[in-house]
Amino acid sequence: MLEGIVRESIGRKAAKALKRDGYLIANIYGKGLENINAAFKVNEFIKEVRKKTTLIFDVKVGSQTLSVVVVDYQKDSVTAELKHVDLKVAQKGVISKYMVPVKITGTAIGLKNKGVLIQSKRRLKVKCAAENLPNFFELDVSKLDVGDALLVRDIVVPAGVTMIDADRVAVVGVEKAR
């Protein structure tokens, strides 16, 4: 389990000092909950996020243990180091919006016919309770030829999950190479 500290002061000076000591600044929030200003060791946070198998993972901040989902993060444009992360508390029974990653499987027929596979959406926006949250959407592209595309409406959505993205939006397609 990832362990962090509660930040007492939330000013720029305090945040810089924490970053200098190897901490990642984080905000944790949820529906009906008070925001928590926290900090995690950067290396520990990266290890935890890489080894997790679900979108939801547990963190311990101070005396609280919370189940959270990564909502957003900021990276340094030059060094690509993590600067800041926003975490949302995944509360059971509370319907909330999440971003779910898209995994592509198979090799498209169109790639052999001088086509290029283009993934226009890497994450899809859904609305559901935390217990119904899928870890990813898996799309099989093996039947796609040049000019074909898989749309949001082609994705099989589990019970209790509602797609927020428009039905006609292309997720992945094969286009003719130039």
UniProtKB/Swiss-Prot annotation:
One of its GO terms (molecular function) is 5S rRNA binding. One of its GO terms (biological process) is translation. InterPro entries: Rbsml_bL25/Gln-tRNA_synth_N, Ribosomal_bL25/Gln-tRNA_synth, Ribosomal_bL25_b-dom, Ribosomal_bL25_C, Ribosomal_bL25_long, Ribosomal_L25_dom, Ribosomal_uL5_bac-type. Keywords: Ribonucleoprotein, Ribosomal protein, RNA-binding, rRNA-binding. GO terms for cellular component: cytosolic large ribosomal subunit. Part of the 50S ribosomal subunit; part of the 5S rRNA/L5/L18/L25 subcomplex. Contacts the 5S rRNA. Binds to the 5S rRNA independently of L5 and L18. This is one of the proteins that binds to the 5S RNA in the ribosome where it forms part of the central protuberance. Belongs to the bacterial ribosomal protein bL25 family. CTC subfamily. This is Large ribosomal subunit protein bL25. It comes from Campylobacter jejuni subsp. jejuni serotype O:23/36 (strain 81-176). The gene is rplY.
